[in-house]
Amino acid sequence: MPKMKTHKGSAKRFKKTGTGQLKRSHAFTSHLFANKTQKQKRKLRKATLVSKGDFKRIRQLLDNVK
């Protein structure tokens, strides 16, 4: 059986925290900022954790990431 390969697109988008959770950045941060409030833009800068429902699926893609 060949080795499992890490999904490289996912590896660039998600980072594992010290407690084993996955950290991700927000969407809607590339353009069209004139339509967003300052509060929205400030909140979008912060990273957040992957939700429980998506965690198992993403973990399979990142099986080999430390």
From Swiss-Prot:
Any one Pfam family match given in the protein's UniProt record, by short name: Ribosomal_L35p
Record region (Disordered): 1-24
InterPro entries, per database record: Ribosomal_bL35, Ribosomal_bL35-like, Ribosomal_bL35_CS, Ribosomal_bL35_sf
Basic residues bias spans: 1-16
Protein known as: Large ribosomal subunit protein bL35
SUPFAM superfamilies cross-referenced by the UniProt entry: L35p-like
Domain of life of the source: Bacteria
Keywords for this protein: Ribonucleoprotein, Ribosomal protein
GO cellular component, as recorded: cytosolic large ribosomal subunit
Coiled coil regions, renumbered to chain: none
Molecular function via GO: structural constituent of ribosome
Family (UniProt): Belongs to the bacterial ribosomal protein bL35 family.
GO biological process: translation
